[in-house]
Amino acid sequence: MSTNQLDTKSQAWSALFSEPMSELVKRYTASVFFDKRLWQADIAGSLAHAEMLAAQQIIGAQDLADIQRGMAQITQEIESGAFEWKLELEDVHLNIEARLTQLVGDAGKRLHTGRSRNDQVATDVRLWLRGEIDATAVLLADMQRALVHVASNNVDVILPGFTHLQVAQPVSFAHHLLAYVEMFARDAERLADLRKRVNRLPLGSAALAGTSYPLDRERVARTLGFDGVCQNSLDAVSDRDFAIEFTGFATLVMIHVSRMAEEIVLWMSQNFGFINLSDRYCTGSSIMPQKRNPDVAELARGKSGRVVGHLMGLITLMKGQPLAYNKDNQEDKEPLFDTVDTVKDTLRIMAEMIGGEVAADGSRSGGLTVKAEAMERAALRGYATATDLADYLVKKGLPFRDAHEVVAHAVKDAIALGKDLSELPLETLQGYNATITADVHAALTLAGSLNARNTLGGTAPSQVRAQIERHQARLG
């Protein structure tokens, strides 16, 4: 029978009802075709629950053995693709329980003792999300390693730094990349912190008020690797703040990715020409033969809006719910699942596009190509060393505001002449202020500008190398 066909079997809860659920309602309320991805967490939670029930003598040893045997077969069936997911059984939980009962009889019916789907699904999602958090942490580290790798090879490459997208001051290209490393490092800290709140066990809270059975919740928590148990049964089954928190974290990651992707798109354009991307990360045009479009970066930028939307959806989902569980919470899974998939895929492909493919031995191939000469030409065109001239005058004794005004006049005249400040003759510069001497030209070079910013966190090459070493030691 097709997984989309309905049979006449009643739901696990249907004994009270005098008429069957309409097929439209079945389709509208079923979640199995998206929540079946929780099957491993569901089986793990059920096995831990069954072991605890047996240890507490709530079910017998033979019941436990039968449940374990049945779950092993169900695992094999799901992994092989032979398991039949049935829409009329609503969700992953009842599909697995129904198959278990079919395989082992009454032992399968005893599994749900002391448990509700309310605490079961909350446990499944937390258990699943914990694994995805750990996988995402690895990808975040890989993203940082890719950026550090490119930075380590481009410490002395000079990029025009921008404010308001206008040339501001020269910076090391490596320094620019390391700014994103810092952002992703904070994201990683947020992820590690939220994991502590995700890793709490709801199971044993039952529908909302706890249970009359002598459950050992701490035992189940230890078996499943949770740090502890949720302390209030109403809260445990009804809140999804952990899903909101993860999606909030993911939103920040995607915003950071989006900013970086925007710069990659700009840098690759002919008007900038600062970098090139491998053909494998670009697409062409169906009408314009010359086009090489940075679609990966553009999609990463676009997908940030998708994740922001999921965050807004989850917040809106929770804002009006009274305690305790409500069916609204079924709507938490699709945005959470898609957020996880989007963040993981985006981090993986962006790290590879920037830093190259990583071989088994740790070597890298590919990655973005840096056009150092184009970056330097752009910095020279934008009077990026104007602040350096002002600083030079301050060191000669002028108040900064006076120095600022002097340099503004010099820049205005240089623009009229079509020259950079460093190209103006000494005599011309001395006409703006008599304290200027021949050493001024050293201050007006791009390299001199970088070297002068030798403060902690600054763009001087010595500082940038120290930053790279710090990140390399941290990331391993």
Curated annotation (Swiss-Prot):
<dbReference type="Pfam" id="PF14698">
    <property type="entry name" value="ASL_C2"/>
</dbReference>
<dbReference type="InterPro" id="IPR020557">
    <property type="entry name" value="Fumarate_lyase_CS"/>
</dbReference>
<dbReference type="GO" id="GO:0004056">
    <property type="term" value="F:argininosuccinate lyase activity"/>
</dbReference>
<dbReference type="GO" id="GO:0006526">
    <property type="term" value="P:L-arginine biosynthetic process"/>
</dbReference>
<keyword id="KW-0456">Lyase</keyword>
<dbReference type="InterPro" id="IPR009049">
    <property type="entry name" value="Argininosuccinate_lyase"/>
</dbReference>
<dbReference type="InterPro" id="IPR008948">
    <property type="entry name" value="L-Aspartase-like"/>
</dbReference>
<comment type="pathway">
    <text>Amino-acid biosynthesis; L-arginine biosynthesis; L-arginine from L-ornithine and carbamoyl phosphate: step 3/3.</text>
</comment>
<dbReference type="InterPro" id="IPR024083">
    <property type="entry name" value="Fumarase/histidase_N"/>
</dbReference>
<dbReference type="InterPro" id="IPR029419">
    <property type="entry name" value="Arg_succ_lyase_C"/>
</dbReference>
<dbReference type="InterPro" id="IPR000362">
    <property type="entry name" value="Fumarate_lyase_fam"/>
</dbReference>
<keyword id="KW-0055">Arginine biosynthesis</keyword>
<comment type="similarity">
    <text>Belongs to the lyase 1 family. Argininosuccinate lyase subfamily.</text>
</comment>
<protein>
    <recommendedName>
        <fullName>Argininosuccinate lyase</fullName>
        <ecNumber>4.3.2.1</ecNumber>
    </recommendedName>
</protein>
<keyword id="KW-0028">Amino-acid biosynthesis</keyword>
<dbReference type="InterPro" id="IPR022761">
    <property type="entry name" value="Fumarate_lyase_N"/>
</dbReference>
<dbReference type="GO" id="GO:0042450">
    <property type="term" value="P:arginine biosynthetic process via ornithine"/>
</dbReference>
<dbReference type="Pfam" id="PF00206">
    <property type="entry name" value="Lyase_1"/>
</dbReference>
<keyword id="KW-0963">Cytoplasm</keyword>
<dbReference type="GO" id="GO:0005829">
    <property type="term" value="C:cytosol"/>
</dbReference>
